[in-house]
Amino acid sequence: MITAEKKKRNKFLPNFEKQSIYSLRYDEMQQWLIDHGQQKFRAKQIFEWLYQKRVNTIDEMTNLSKELRQILKDHFAMTTLTTVVKQESKDGTIKFLFELQDGYTIETVLMRHEYGNSVCVTTQVGCRIGCTFCASTLGGLKRNLEAGEIVSQVLTVQKALDETNERVSQIVIMGIGEPFENYDEMMDFLRIVNDDNSLNIGARHITVSTSGIIPRIYDFAEEDIQINFAVSLHGAKDEIRSRLMPINRAYNVDKLMEAIRYYQEKTNRRVTFEYGLFGGVNDQLEHARDLAHLIKNLNCHVNLIPVNHVPERNYVKTPKDDIFKFEKELKRLGINATIRREQGSDIDAACGQLRAKERQVETR
C-alpha cells in the first residue's frame, strides 16, 4: 500500500487519485478494513475475488455488502492493463506490451518451460541505470510502478493461461527497470504474490535480479523471505564491467562482492550471476578465468546469456562454439555454470526491444 512515507522515499511513484487495490498486502487489507469500520475476515473474501476468481470489477464481489463494495470503489482502482501488442514466438514465448492508465507502456514476457510457466515482470517505466547493451534505457526512466501494477502483469498473464487451464508457476523480476530502485513496491509485490491468500507462488519459485544497487543488497539480506537472488555481473573486472554497466562506476566490483558475501552470510542462500556474452568484449577464455577467480569462494551459479542483438547498440553475438568453450572453462575451474536457453529471439524478446520499437512508431 502506498503511504505518504513511501511517496517521500520514492519520488518516482505515480500520483494517481486512487491507488490500485492490488497494491495492498493481505495484512494491509485487514488493517484497512478495521480502520474503515469493517470486519477483518472480509480481507479473505476480497483476496479470493481478486486472486482466485480473478474478477474484473469490485461489483462482482457479490458476497460483500453493497456498502462495502462502494467503500472499496471510493478508495481503490481495479488496475487494468491494456494489451497494445502481443507477440508469440515459435517456441511458445509470448511477449506483451501493456499500456498503463497514464498511457505509458511496459513489457511482460511469458516463457514456457518443461517445468512450468514463468513470467518476467517489469518494475519501472524505462530505466536510468544505463547499461550500454540494453534497450530499456534508451528513453530513460519515466516513473516507478505501483506494486499493484506489477501484480497486474502476473494476473493478466494468468487470465490468459486460464483459457487453457494452465497456471503461472514461476516469476522472474528481470523485465524493464532496476527492481532495487523501486525497492518498497518490489517487496510489497513479492509478499503479495507469495501469500497463501493470493497467487501462492512459492518464494523459491521467484527470482529478483539487480544490476548491483549495493545499499539495497544489504537491505535485501535482512528480509525474511527466501526469494532467489541474481546479480547482473557481465564483467569480472572494473574496466569491462564499467564499459557495459555504468553503475559499476558508483558500485565497483570489489564493493559488489563485499555486499554479496554479506548477503550469503546472512541468508546462506546461493546467488546466481547473470553473465551476458558480448563478442570480443567479455567472451574470451581469459575472461572466464577472471570470473572464476572472482567468485570461486562463493555459493553461486553462473547463467551464461547469449545476447540478443539490439539495433540501437553495436554489440554482436558470441559464436556458439566460443560460448561452449567459455562454459567448459568455468566448469574446469570448479564453477557451476549453464547456458541460458534462447527464447523469443524471433519476437523482440530482449528486454525493452518491443517497447523501443513502439516508441519509434509513436514518434515518427
Swiss-Prot record:
Question: Which residue ranges does the record assign to the Radical SAM core domain?
Answer: 113-346
Pfam families in alphabetical order = Radical_SAM (PF04055), RlmN_N (PF21016)
Q: What is its EC number?
A: 2.1.1.192
Q: Where is the active site?
A: E107 (proton acceptor), C351 (s-methylcysteine intermediate)
Is 4Fe-4S found in the keyword set?
yes
Q: Which cofactor does it need?
A: [4Fe-4S] cluster
- Coiled coil regions in record: none
* Transmembrane portions of the chain: none
Question: Cystine bridges: which residues?
Answer: C120-C351
Q: Which GO terms describe its cellular component?
A: cytoplasm
Binding residues annotated for S-adenosyl-L-methionine, in chain numbering: G177, E178, S209, S232, L233, H234, N308
Locations listed in the record: Cytoplasm
Return one Gene Ontology term, BP aspect.
response to antibiotic
Catalytic activity of the protein = adenosine(2503) in 23S rRNA + 2 reduced [2Fe-2S]-[ferredoxin] + 2 S-adenosyl-L-methionine = 2-methyladenosine(2503) in 23S rRNA + 5'-deoxyadenosine + L-methionine + 2 oxidized [2Fe-2S]-[ferredoxin] + S-adenosyl-L-homocysteine; adenosine(37) in tRNA + 2 reduced [2Fe-2S]-[ferredoxin] + 2 S-adenosyl-L-methionine = 2-methyladenosine(37) in tRNA + 5'-deoxyadenosine + L-methionine + 2 oxidized [2Fe-2S]-[ferredoxin] + S-adenosyl-L-homocysteine
The Gene Ontology terms for molecular function here are:
4 iron, 4 sulfur cluster binding; metal ion binding; rRNA (adenine(2503)-C2-)-methyltransferase activity; rRNA binding; tRNA (adenine(37)-C2)-methyltransferase activity; tRNA binding
* Record key words, sorted: 4Fe-4S, Antibiotic resistance, Cytoplasm, Disulfide bond, Iron, Iron-sulfur, Metal-binding, Methyltransferase, rRNA processing, S-adenosyl-L-methionine, Transferase, tRNA processing
**How many cofactors are bound and how?**
Binds 1 [4Fe-4S] cluster. The cluster is coordinated with 3 cysteines and an exchangeable S-adenosyl-L-methionine.
* Residues noted as binding [4Fe-4S] cluster in the record, renumbered to the chain: C127, C131, C134
Q: Report the HAMAP family cross-referenced here.
A: RNA_methyltr_RlmN
Q: What is stated as this protein's family in its record?
A: Belongs to the radical SAM superfamily. RlmN family.
- List, alphabetically, the NCBIfam families matched: rRNA_mod_RlmN
What is known about what this protein does?
A: Specifically methylates position 2 of adenine 2503 in 23S rRNA and position 2 of adenine 37 in tRNAs. Confers resistance to some classes of antibiotics.
Q: Misc remark for this entry? A: Reaction proceeds by a ping-pong mechanism involving intermediate methylation of a conserved cysteine residue.
Protein's UniProt name: Probable dual-specificity RNA methyltransferase RlmN
Organism, scientific name: Staphylococcus epidermidis (strain ATCC 12228 / FDA PCI 1200)
- Gene symbol of the encoding locus: rlmN
